[in-house]
Amino acid sequence: MHKARLRGHCARAGKSVRLASSGMTRRDPLTNKVALVTASTDWIGFAVAQRLAQDGAHVVVSRRKQQNVDQAVATLQGEGLSMTGTVCHVGKMKDWERLVATAMKLHGVIDILSLSITNSKRGLFWFTLLQTAEEAWDRNLDINGKALALMIKAVVPEMEKRGGGSVGFLASVAAFRPLPGFSPYNVSKTALLGLNKTLAIELAPRNIRVNCLAPGLIKTSFSRMLWMDKEKEESMKETLRIRRLGEPEDSLGIVSFLCSEDASYLTGETVMVGGGTPSRL
């Protein structure tokens, strides 16, 4: 049923596919903006897609599996939000091209790119330096570094046609305070801080802003091994100024702000959302 609904929605691409989002009670800072959100069928990515649509954007979600895309689209359309989706494996160039082409076919423009990419092969980053195989280094740096850069490269020409845009992606508190036993992950997330600064400089003349979010310990499937163990959870809370673990929703206002015109003079910034986790001066 969900697949049929998504196919039916995409089949109407020749007509207006911009559904009017309903039930909003606040100003819509992203009205008529078009946003691509990767890895957006669950957890933080899903919450980001939902919030951007609630704030007025027309959102294209993506994930590796069609059934997950269909379910997310059906759920969010059911809330009266303007939502479409397509399959996208961030490690495959053809999938990036299809994601961009889908957005352009449906909406004609791209204003926002939100990259919520996580390495899905969890066993490839829980290692120290001496335990880490070459495959783990390749996988982490490919997904958390190269794939993001190339995805942004694919979108920039379309943003330029629009006169500019906003790019955002996720680093981690581990970029500032490395997690013991997560060497490949720590290094790949630290690399994103450099990517953020570099692209902010390169893309500013094109009126494209680039900013980064660095979440702390947020309750997601990635961190499940920590918060599902009550003893570990309590130990983690001791490192926080705000004595609770984060929820995906804790980042949403900041993401929407960074994508909006309210942040038009912000680029190259990394915002920590970590409950006061000690991370830098």
Curated annotation (Swiss-Prot):
Keyword check for NAD: yes
Residue window of motif Peroxisomal targeting signal: 279-281
Single GO BP term: retinal metabolic process
Keyword list, A-Z: NAD, NADP, Oxidoreductase
Keyword set includes NADP: yes
Family: Belongs to the short-chain dehydrogenases/reductases (SDR) family.
Protein name: Putative dehydrogenase/reductase SDR family member 4-like 1
Name of the encoding gene: DHRS4L1
